[in-house]
């Protein structure tokens, strides 16, 4: 191999390294963007989990109040089931649909 061939091979190798370096820089930039997005999503997820915990603590109280209101209406002689909602119960007869709604767990 003469000096010119050696120089050309070294020049080609240098160009290949520059192209590879550019590709590595592009991958590095893309990775940085993905990591930043991942961090942002983790923070948002943590905030949403905290908020969900707060909402779950509030929900049983609201549900209990709503169910108590429905029971009061039922004991006042009205249907609270979806089929007959608001209609008066004849002779205060039991309604299995209302009972299921009021006493389900």
UniProtKB/Swiss-Prot annotation:
An example Pfam family from this entry, by short name, is YabA
Which residues make up the binding site for Zn(2+)?
A: 79, 81, 95, 98
A single GO cellular-component term on record = nucleoid
Free-text comment on the cofactor: Binds 1 zinc ion per subunit.
InterPro entries from the UniProt entry: YabA
Q: Which keywords has UniProt assigned to this entry?
A: Cytoplasm, DNA replication, DNA replication inhibitor, Metal-binding, Zinc
Which Cys-Cys disulphide bridges does the record give? none
* GO biological process, any: DNA replication
Location comes to: Cytoplasm, Nucleoid
- What are its cofactors? Zn(2+)
Q: Belongs to which family?
A: Belongs to the YabA family.
Job description of the protein:
Involved in control of chromosome replication initiation. Inhibits the cooperative binding of DnaA to the oriC region, thus negatively regulating initiation of chromosome replication. Inhibits the ability of DnaA-ATP to form a helix on DNA; does not disassemble preformed DnaA-DNA helices. Decreases the residence time of DnaA on the chromosome at its binding sites (oriC, replication forks and promoter-binding sites). Tethers DnaA to the replication machinery via the DNA polymerase beta sliding clamp subunit (dnaN).
Subunit structure and binding partners: Homotetramer. Interacts with both DnaA and DnaN, acting as a bridge between these two proteins.
Please identify the protein, giving its name as recorded: Replication initiation control protein YabA
